[in-house]
Design a protein with these regions (language model features):
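Short, Lys/Arg-rich, polar N-terminal cytosolic tail immediately upstream
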Residues: 1-15
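A structural signal for multi-pass alpha-helical bundles of membrane permease subunits
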Residues: 16-304
Length: 304
């Protein structure tokens, strides 16, 4: 096999490489136009005090690090990071555990289980704005069937999204409902790839269901769990529709995560340069998290 691969590699000459590059060039140009160019422009704007009310500010590079240094002394920015940390940690942990539990329950090949898998995926395939509107209705006392049912039982509950103590956790609950099927799907796919032979041998030796999971299935699916958690962690940093629809960052700033804070700086106060700097820092954070968790996942893999 190695000899065959070496022969193929040596058989590709400059003309063939040029032909391959020519074929890929349209895709490369499109990728650069849609992603790299806007990202580069965002970075350039972050080096200026850009605001639409002062056109000359778009080309003012006299203090290129002012926005980044200013963020370090901005209490609302640091508060938004803390809110983001609480939201990300709670949702990723909850979604990973729920996804793992649901995957274990649905790891069977029956018609009922197949139907249940489809039902479990419904929240994930809904447009995010639709999911947000569903929870807006459920959290609004005047129209919520949940609140009306509790009121009929003489157990009235105040709106969770207008209470500073519960608003963030209400968003975390809605986000978990919407996205735990994603982690379930990835973990379920990994569970179905676990070799049958070790499981059967362990059953013959009298291993319990918990022992089968802990010593055989969990080590095998651990990389998939890490990947699922990584994707959800990155998506939690991009959280926007639920917060925009349910609380608009309130009450006060209790649900104002970092990207929503950048949104308000750009579109409420027209501080484009500062908002761009926040967006660049968020992007750098996402890349750093991707590298860190990817490295941890590679080390924890039984094949790594």
């Amino acid at each position: 096999m190695a000899a065959a691969v070496a022969t193929i590699e040596h058989g590709i000459g400059p003309r063939q490489r040029l032909a391959v590059l020519s074929g890929l060039m349209p895709a490369i140009v499109l990728l650069a136009a849609l992603t790299l160019a806007p990202a580069l422009y965002l970075f350039v704007i972050s080096l200026t005090p850009a605001t639409p009310t002062v056109p000359a500010s778009l080309t003012d590079f006299s203090a290129p690090l002012q926005n980044y240094l200013g963020a370090l002394h901005d209490a609302r920015f640091t508060d938004s990071l803390w809110v983001q940390l609480k939201l990300s940690a709670s949702t990723v942990i909850a979604q990973t555990l729920l996804g793992l539990g649901a995957a274990l329950l649905l790891n069977h090949r029956t018609r009922l289980v197949q139907a249940l898998r489809t039902v479990f995926l419904i929240p994930m395939v809904l447009p995010p704005i639709v999911a947000a509107l569903i929870w807006k209705i459920l959290y609004t006392p005047d129209i919520s069937p949940m609140h009306r049912a509790l009121a009929a039982l003489n157990m009235p509950v105040k709106s969770l999204i207008t209470n500073p103590d519960t608003a963030l956790w209400a968003i975390a609950f809605a986000d978990t409902w919407e996205w735990f099927p994603f982690t379930m799907l990835i973990i379920l796919a990994a569970l179905q790839m676990v070799p049958r032979e070790p499981l059967e041998a362990a059953r013959v030796d009298g291993a319990s269901r918990l022992q089968l999971f802990w010593y055989i299935e969990l080590p095998f699916i651990q990389p998939a769990i890490v990947v699922a958690a990584l994707f959800r962690l990155i998506d939690s940093i991009k959280a926007f529709p639920l917060i925009y629809v349910l609380t608009s960052g309130g009450p006060g700033t209790t649900t104002q995560v970092t990207n929503y804070y950048a949104f308000t700086q750009a579109f409420n106060y027209a501080y484009w340069g500062y908002a761009s700097a926040i967006a660049i820092m968020l992007t750098a954070g996402v890349f750093a998290l991707s590298w860190l968790i990817g490295s941890l996942g590679a080390r924890s893999s039984p094949h790594g």
